[in-house]
Swiss-Prot record:
<comment type="function">
    <text>Catalyzes the synthesis of GMP from XMP.</text>
</comment>
<feature type="active site">
    <location>
        <position position="175"/>
    </location>
</feature>
<keyword id="KW-0067">ATP-binding</keyword>
<comment type="pathway">
    <text>Purine metabolism; GMP biosynthesis; GMP from XMP (L-Gln route): step 1/1.</text>
</comment>
<feature type="active site">
    <location>
        <position position="177"/>
    </location>
</feature>
<keyword id="KW-0436">Ligase</keyword>
<dbReference type="InterPro" id="IPR001674">
    <property type="entry name" value="GMP_synth_C"/>
</dbReference>
<dbReference type="GO" id="GO:0005524">
    <property type="term" value="F:ATP binding"/>
</dbReference>
<dbReference type="GO" id="GO:0003921">
    <property type="term" value="F:GMP synthase activity"/>
</dbReference>
<comment type="subunit">
    <text>Homodimer.</text>
</comment>
<feature type="domain" description="GMPS ATP-PPase">
    <location>
        <begin position="201"/>
        <end position="386"/>
    </location>
</feature>
<feature type="domain" description="Glutamine amidotransferase type-1">
    <location>
        <begin position="3"/>
        <end position="200"/>
    </location>
</feature>
<dbReference type="InterPro" id="IPR017926">
    <property type="entry name" value="GATASE"/>
</dbReference>
<keyword id="KW-0315">Glutamine amidotransferase</keyword>
<keyword id="KW-0332">GMP biosynthesis</keyword>
<feature type="binding site">
    <location>
        <begin position="228"/>
        <end position="234"/>
    </location>
    <ligand>
        <name>ATP</name>
    </ligand>
</feature>
<dbReference type="InterPro" id="IPR025777">
    <property type="entry name" value="GMPS_ATP_PPase_dom"/>
</dbReference>
Length: 520
């Protein structure tokens, strides 16, 4: 299978490079800049990402692997693409002067294509002016020996693309992986062609390869899984079940903090052991208001209950988790060709004393790929396209102390909010929507009487990966705006007229950053 190694020097856009390449049916992995070259020497090509560093900072550890890749290119002619800081590293290595700017350039700007190159073939014509996104503090003043300037900035004549066709080394000062760059994905596609990558990274191939890996490692032994009903958990369970069948034992723990009437809707043939521990969780949360303390109590209690249920199954050697690639990258564990199955090391908070090996069938898939895989397996759209739900459940959406009554109120609000949203055909246009119950009461009037009830906040955001988010529908000046305002008026009326104890509804307009998506 063809594969590209992406060396991450800290760019906020690195995952976008990987997503674009994956969408072109080519496998790629992201590695930290301190990775040993031996780990990545078998890849078909290398991309050096952008980053906040400067070649003048003397970051020997960061530049070390880049230098080894360039030396490897000299011996093998393996293709290299340097983006932003990656360009500066490459050009600096070959002796070009890299100028340290006093002011960072972060904007959409125009470049002019000056010469033909295989990296811009059928993407941009010579003499054409192209919109690109620049995000850099340093710039390359002169092309290194053996390199040709392919494009430069229209306004400031910054070297935008350089290429050494003989060595198959290409560099861009701009970011081809982001949307402001016109046809940037086609430039990346050209690089894949230069690297002779086969377009064979498909959902069918992923399923078959992962099934084979799981079978080979698990053998005839038992696997246990704590299932939540979320997208990642459900897809991981379905894929693992297809590999080992009834060797997989699924446990669903009702914490009392789930959505109203929440159940696990997996493939019909997958058995699930339901355990109701709602009274235990709620009793341990009594009097607790700090969100971190709530999370800790829920996590520890969950581990305790899961251990008890695992002992009932007995003789399990493997624990399955729905870890996905963004979890791995963001936690700093994207290093080396880690196997899909590895020794348990307290991922997810489960204690080492359980002595289980970890099965992570989705470890190298992004969220959008997980959804596609779930569809290929046969899971329903209701499972695949559901909104994210926090691990601690409604405990972090009931602000302040959590008790059975407040959870009940929030469950009622949540059900009305989500169902009404679906009736307005808005649910699939929103990345995440939920309600929050606030620990304050306000005065209201219903009929001829005074009320003193809770305030609930509604939140709906659009996002690509949850790293940033905008309040719906303000990032999208479309017909959805008018529909959404009508929806908000209607759903707030339904809530206050049907949920006892609530007399006021507010809407959260804050983007991320500065706020987080969840309130706690």
């Amino acid at each position: 299978m063809s594969a590209i190694a992406i060396i991450d020097f800290g760019s906020q856009f690195t995952q976008l490079i990987a997503r674009q390449i994956r969408e072109m049916d080519v496998y790629c992995e992201i590695f930290p800049s301190n990775i040993s070259f031996e780990t990545i020497s078998k890849f078909n090509g290398f991309i050096l990402s952008g980053g906040p560093q400067s070649v003048h900072d003397g970051c020997s550890e960061a530049s070390g692997v880049a230098h080894e890749i360039i030396k490897f290119n000299e011996a093998t002619n393996v293709p290299i693409l340097g983006i932003c800081y990656g360009q500066q590293l490459i050009c600096h290595y070959f002796g070009a002067k890299v100028k340290k700017e006093f002011k960072q350039e972060f904007c959409k700007t125009k470049i002019k294509i000056l010469k033909e190159s295989s990296i811009v073939k059928d993407v941009w014509n010579v003499n054409s002016e192209v919109d690109v996104l620049m995000n850099h503090a340093d710039s390359v003043e002169t092309a290194p020996q053996g390199f040709t300037v392919i494009a430069s900035g229209v306004i400031n004549q910054t070297i935008a693309i350089v290429a050494n066709e003989q060595r198959r080394i290409y560099c861009t000062q701009f970011h081809p992986e982001v949307k402001p760059t016109a046809n940037g994905s086609k430039l990346l596609s050209n690089f894949l062609d230069i690297a002779n990558c086969k377009r064979d990274w498909t959902m069918k191939s992923i399923i078959e390869k992962q099934k084979e890996k799981i079978k080979n490692v698990v053998g005839e032994k038992k696997v246990i899984a704590a299932v939540s009903g979320g997208v990642d958990s459900s897809v991981a369970v379905a894929l693992t079940y297809k590999a080992v069948g009834k060797q997989l034992n699924c446990i669903f723990i009702d914490t009392g903090l789930l959505r109203k009437n929440q159940t696990i809707a997996l493939l019909e043939e997958i058995p699930v052991n339901y355990v109701d521990k709602s009274n235990l969780f709620l009793s341990r949360l009594k009097g607790i208001t700090d969100p971190e303390e709530k999370r800790k109590i829920i996590g520890n209690t969950f581990i305790e209950v899961f251990e008890e249920e695992a002992k009932k199954i007995g003789n399990a050697d493997f624990l399955m988790q729905g870890t996905i690639y963004s979890d791995v990258v963001e936690s700093g564990h994207a290093s080396g060709n880690a196997s899909t199955i590895k020794s348990h090391h307290n991922v997810g908070g489960l204690p080492e004393k359980m002595n289980l090996k970890l099965v992570e069938p989705l470890r190298y898939l992004f969220k959008d790929e997980v959804r596609l895989l779930g569809k290929e397996i046969g899971l329903s759209n209701e499972i695949i396209f559901q909104h994210p739900f926090p691990g601690p459940g409604l405990a972090v959406r009931v602000i302040g102390e959590v008790d059975e009554e407040r959870v009940r109120i929030l469950q009622e609000i949540d059900e009305i909010y989500i169902n009404t949203m679906k009736n307005y055909d808005l649910y699939d246009k929103i990345w995440q929507a939920f309600a929050v119950l606030l620990p304050i009461r306000t005065v209201g009037v219903m009929g001829d009487g005074r009320t003193y009830g809770y305030v609930c906040a509604l939140r709906a955001v659009t996002s690509f990966d949850g790293m940033t988010a905008d309040a719906f529908p303000f990032e999208n000046k479309s017909q959805h705006s008018l529909i959404f305002w009508d929806f908000l008026q209607n759903v707030s009326s339904i809530i206050v007229n049907n949920v006892s104890g609530v007399n006021r509804v507010v809407y959260d307009l804050t983007s991320k950053p500065p706020a987080t998506i969840e309130w706690e």
